[in-house]
Design a protein with these regions (language model features):
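Non-catalytic terminal extensions that flank enzyme cores
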Residues: 7-13, 18, 23-25, 32-37, ...
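Conserved oxyanion/phosphate-binding beta-strand-loop segments in alpha/beta enzyme cores
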Residues: 61-65, 74-116, 191-204, 312-340, ...
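Residue patterns forming the tRNA-binding/recognition surfaces of aminoacyl-tRNA synthetases
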Residues: 62-73, 77, 82, 90-91, ...
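Feature 926 captures the class I aminoacyl-tRNA synthetase adenylation module centered on the KMSKS loop
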Residues: 67-70, 276, 471, 475-552, ...
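N-terminal catalytic cores of NTP/NDP-binding nucleotidyl/phosphoryl-transfer enzymes
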Residues: 107-168, 230, 292-294, 299, ...
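Short, solvent-exposed turn/loop segments enriched in Gly/Ser/Thr/Pro and often Arg
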Residues: 108-110, 118-119, 152-165, 221-226, ...
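Extended active-site and interfacial segments that coordinate phosphate-rich ligands
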Residues: 131-139, 290-323, 350-355, 367-373, ...
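Metal-dependent nuclease catalytic cores in nucleic-acid-processing enzymes
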Residues: 135-152, 358-369, 401-404, 588-604, ...
Length: 1004
């Protein structure tokens, strides 16, 4: 039969460039890297059915030797001074991927943890939005993997119909070729050529962010498996009566010549003009008219009514009369009353153009107005526009207004700020038009999706977005699913014609064909079989040329990637539904809600039970990043400069669920320093082991675990060790709980505080006296505990900063092949509350002494004497035992420092010679003034300070006591000035007291 039918081949799988080899010997501490394997293709493109390729040479490493094999690590001298991210990131990533750590651990006993990656456009280049979702999803994935769950983070890319077509069209135009110069098949071939060359770019860029997703399962929305899913979904929905062809208003992109989704339309405030003109009343004289205002005078040619508010006394008497549409040969339209009309806008009379305005379209449907289309698909005026036929819409506006002025119909034109709809892809002005398209009924599909939130089966974080979600689904409109593009999922509809001649005539008069008869099928053969069964043998088939909206295939993503419609596919059984969907709040309706509706419709299940929404990444001033503002921060540039870990930690710790993040470049630099702090902590631990043999270093691994194993073991440790282990255990619980609540910012900040404050600034600083003291056994205990705490801290930090933690862990003595495969620190471990309290008191002692040293400008290296008075016997004993630690941290002269239960006689006899520091009701510290500073120099310094402060007080006092200032200035300003004066006077009193103290010492 002569069918005129042709099925376009679709390339279904992506190919990716083999990553550059990197020497990972440093990362593996002597373990030779496996031979590199090429990245798997996502499919093939040929006339035959493609074979899905999966390179799985090595699965998740679970053997006992890999999990427990010991390594002494490296030597301190082997490590560079600072963390060199550029030297390790590629090698570590390659090691993780090649050794199978990104695949699900099939032997894991925990519940599966599955995240479907929101598929970025295959045309895309990495931006901060990608960096945000990759960071957060990787934090979740790495944490779940370490917590023993069978973890799958499933990656992929979207074919991005409009974006890709636009990119390829621009490339062809640069070569002097237009899309219309070639056939559809030739253009599609060019698209596939482009994808083969550039399609893997976004994948490689996502890898630069450390994404630990299973690349062996990578999917593409046009691969064969997903194409089969799309066909099945369309046919299923059509068979249920949910897909239909109808006429409706759509967003039309004249240059692309396709309908676009609401998401692909961006509104911008732009300077424009509001045109006021006379709408002549039929049968009236020159003064019989309705004054009307419009921003688009060219659409007057498509008016089918003029509306006034029935409550408007100026015009309500004209309801029922008719107006004559200018330049249409006398065509008349009714004047109608409608409460929609805003009496305060413009003139209070509204021209109604149902064919080119969404609001007018709704009014027209409600009152039964005609719909007149005045534009061709390319944005030129059509034959309904008389002499303006063929004129571009923008030129028509200018010409028509000039004609209105010439005819005396123009009243005035004044500046007006318009909200202009523009194509997100091409930037062109979108034209609302009424068009015949394919639609999907949404009200029925929305019901179970609404119920899921109402019953709590689906949780949206943050919760406030549940209200938005419900509002959208409650007032949902049918979804326009057809697009007039050449690339994408071609709609599986075949129109039925009686003959080839009939088809040819239909094509001349109607792009879609005049026949309303059609069949829905999976392929040519099935279409022919169905058509013959319904209409007989003497027929010709013509396939629908439109393709499906990209969001249609994306809406199937959570289950199509797992093998649906094959319900028995292993991944459908093991990894569907997903655990969580993480994405930006801006696509909650356009993608998330549609996935939920499609999943219920196709599988009867929710696609995931939790939706976590992040906000936009803005610049430091809170502005949206854009090329026009010159404020775009390139994540790849940040990675090259500051390192991947610094970027990830900045994004993760700066995020609050659903809130936008203002990206501070200073914070990036600070977090780069944080990664170096982790590096230096590792070097410190290695330096403390420098004299140990490999066997002794390995022995520390198990010794540290034993010393910190439980309450009984921890109780035997010195105070500082009990404190740091307890702080670690409490931090593990807090971080785990925060991550379980998707509060990644709090989790990251908690780890930062523990590492920087507790571990590095307090514990490591204090440990030096024990590590390098005369007591060898105490030194060994401290080494073992320090190694244990750093190991567990690295595990805790790893999901956030994977590279520096892996590199440091590889350098330390350890068991196992890689940090990525280690267990999460124990949750609910013992916290020694009394030890924490005692050490916090010790910290207060040290902090107060440090403050006093700063106030008296004591040189940092100078050690001073002190008297610590603890009236509580138990505390007295505890601080006496920790005198070396206190002296180390506070820079005290340990030989001249005592711990007593009451002030010594020399203090009691001359308290004026001491600085008294009250820590709490039972704890005081006395510092001899003579030991703090040179009295003569200090008197001179303080006297200068006194003079300066007195001058400031005199000036501020005059201002505060001025009736003019008090009576005229705002009350808040006056109160602020009085507070400043009070503070200065208090500080001056302190300075004078110190001068007196020092002068007393000089006189002696």
């Amino acid at each position: 039969m002569a069918s005129g039918l042709r099925t376009l081949a679709r390339a279904t799988l992506t190919r990716h460039a083999r990553p550059a080899r990197a020497n990972v010997a440093r990362a593996l501490a002597g373990v030779a890297p496996a031979r590199a394997s090429p990245a798997p293709a996502a499919g093939t493109r040929s006339g035959k059915a493609p074979v899905r390729v999966a390179v799985r040479a090595r699965g998740y490493p679970t053997s006992a030797d890999v999990k427990t094999m010991p390594s002494p690590g490296r030597r301190h001298g082997d490590l560079p001074k600072n963390f060199e991210h550029e030297a390790v990131e590629e090698g570590l990533y390659q090691m993780w991927e090649e050794r199978g750590y990104f695949r699900p651990n099939e032997s894991a006993t925990g519940a599966p943890f599955v995240i479907p990656m929101p598929p970025p456009n295959v045309t895309g280049a990495l931006h901060m939005g990608h960096a945000m979702f990759v960071t957060l999803q990787d934090v979740m994935t790495r944490s779940a993997r370490m917590r023993g769950r069978k973890t799958l983070w499933l990656p992929g890319t979207d074919h991005a119909g409009i974006a890709t077509q636009l990119v390829v069209e621009r490339k062809l135009e640069s070569e002097g070729v237009k899309r219309t110069d070639m056939s559809r098949e030739e253009f599609v071939e060019k698209v596939w050529e482009w994808k083969a060359e550039y399609g893997g770019r976004i994948q490689q860029q996502i890898k630069r962010l450390g994404a630990s997703c299973d690349w062996s399962r990578e999917r593409f929305t046009l691969d064969d498996g997903l194409s089969e899913s799309v066909l099945e979904a369309f046919i299923t929905l059509h068979d249920r009566g949910l897909i239909y062809k109808g006429t409706y208003m759509v967003n039309w992109a004249p240059k692309l010549q396709t309908a676009v989704s609401d998401l692909e339309v961006e509104y911008s405030e732009e300077p424009g003009t509001l045109y006021f003109f006379k709408y002549p009343v039929e049968g009236g004289g020159p003064d019989d008219y309705l004054p009307v205002a419009t921003t688009r005078p060219e659409t007057i040619l498509g008016d089918t009514a003029v509306a006034v508010n029935p409550e408007d006394d100026r015009f309500k008497h004209m309801i029922g009369k008719k107006c004559v549409v200018p330049f249409t040969g006398g065509r008349t339209v009714p004047i109608i009353g409608d409460s929609y009309v805003d009496m305060e806008f413009g003139t209070g009379a509204l021209k109604i153009t149902p064919g080119h305005d969404p609001n007018d379209y709704e009014i027209g449907k409600r009152v039964g107005l005609d719909i007149i289309n005045i534009m061709n698909k390319d944005g030129t005026m059509n034959s309904n526009c008389g002499k303006y036929n063929g004129v571009d819409r923008a030129d028509c506006r200018t010409q028509l207004w000039a004609d209105m002025e010439a005819e005396g119909l123009a009243i005035k034109a004044e500046p007006y700020t318009n909200r202009v709809p523009r194509s997100q892809r091409g930037g062109e002005v979108i034209e609302p038009i009424v068009s015949e398209q394919w639609f999907c009924k949404m009200d029925t599909m929305a019901e179970p999706s609404l119920k899921a939130v109402e019953t709590g089966e689906l949780t949206i974080i943050p919760q406030r977005f549940e209200k938005i979600y419900k509002s959208w689904l409650t007032d949902i409109r049918d979804w326009c699913i057809s697009r007039q593009l050449w690339r994408g999922h071609q709609i599986p509809v075949w129109y039925v014609h009686d003959s080839a001649e009939d088809l040819a005539r239909a094509r001349e008069g109607d792009r879609k064909g005049a026949s309303k008869r059609y069949v829905v099928a999976r392929n040519d053969a099935e279409a022919e079989e169905k058509a013959k069964a319904q209409y007989g043998d003497n027929i010709v088939l013509h396939r629908e040329e439109d393709v499906l909206d990209t969001w249609f295939s994306s809406g199937l993503w959570p289950f199509s990637t797992c093998g649906w419609p094959n319900e028995e596919a292993p991944d459908m059984k093991n990894y569907f539904p997903a655990s969580v969907l993480e994405t930006g709040h801006d696509i909650l309706f356009f993608w998330v809600a549609r996935m939920i509706m499609m999943s219920y419709g196709m599988t009867g299940k929710l696609p995931f039970h939790t939706v976590f929404l992040h906000g936009l990444v803005r610049d430091s001033q809170g502005r949206k990043m854009s090329k026009s503002l010159g404020n775009v921060v390139d994540p790849l540039g940040v990675i090259a400069d500051q390192g991947c870990d610094a970027l990830r930690f900045t994004l993760a710790t700066g995020t609050t669920p659903g809130q936008d993040l203002n990206l501070n470049l200073d914070r990036l630099a600070s977090n780069r320093n944080f990664t170096n702090k982790i590096w230096n902590a590792g070097k410190f631990v290695l330096y403390s082991m420098e004299e140990m043999t490999d066997e002794e270093r390995v022995a520390l691994i198990d010794e540290g675990s034993a010393l910190c194993a439980d309450e009984a073991s921890i109780a035997k440790l010195p105070l500082a060790e009990r404190w740091i282990v307890s702080k670690l255990n409490a931090t593990v619980d807090h971080v785990t709980n925060a991550q379980d609540k998707y509060d990644f910012g709090e989790a990251g900040r908690s780890m930062y505080t523990f590492f920087y404050d507790s571990f590095a600034d307090w514990f490591i600083e204090g440990a030096k006296s024990r590590l390098y003291g005369a007591d060898a056994e105490a030194a060994r205990v401290t080494k073992a505990v320090t190694l244990y705490v750093l190991d567990r801290t690295l595990r805790l930090l790893h999901p956030f900063v994977p590279y520096v933690t892996e590199e440091v862990w590889q350098a330390l003595p350890h068991r196992g092949e890689a940090l990525i495969g280690q267990d999460w620190p124990e949750i609910g471990a013992f916290v020694d509350a009394p030890a924490v309290s005692s050490f916090e008191n010790l910290q207060m002692i040290v902090t107060r002494i440090r403050n006093a040293r700063a106030e008296y400008s004591v040189e940092p290296a100078k050690r001073i004497p002190a008297v610590i008075v603890a009236t509580d016997a138990q505390a007295n004993s505890a601080y006496g035992a920790e005198i070396n630690l206190i002296s180390t941290l506070a820079r005290l002269d340990v030989a001249e420092t005592v711990v007593a239960s009451a002030p010594p006689d020399e203090v009691a006899a001359a308290p004026e010679n001491y600085v008294q520091i009250i820590v709490n009701d039972s704890l005081e510290v006395y510092l001899p003034l003579a030991g703090l500073a040179d009295p003569v120099k200090e008197v001179a310094r303080l006297t200068k300070q006194e003079t300066k402060m007195q001058k400031e007080i005199d000036g501020l006092s005059g201002r505060v006591n001025s009736p003019s200032f008090v009576n005229k200035a705002p009350a808040a300003v006056v109160e602020k000035a009085r507070k400043e004066l009070s503070d200065l006077e208090e500080n001056l009193a302190v300075v004078r007291s110190r001068i007196a103290q020092m002068q007393a010492l000089v006189s002696k």
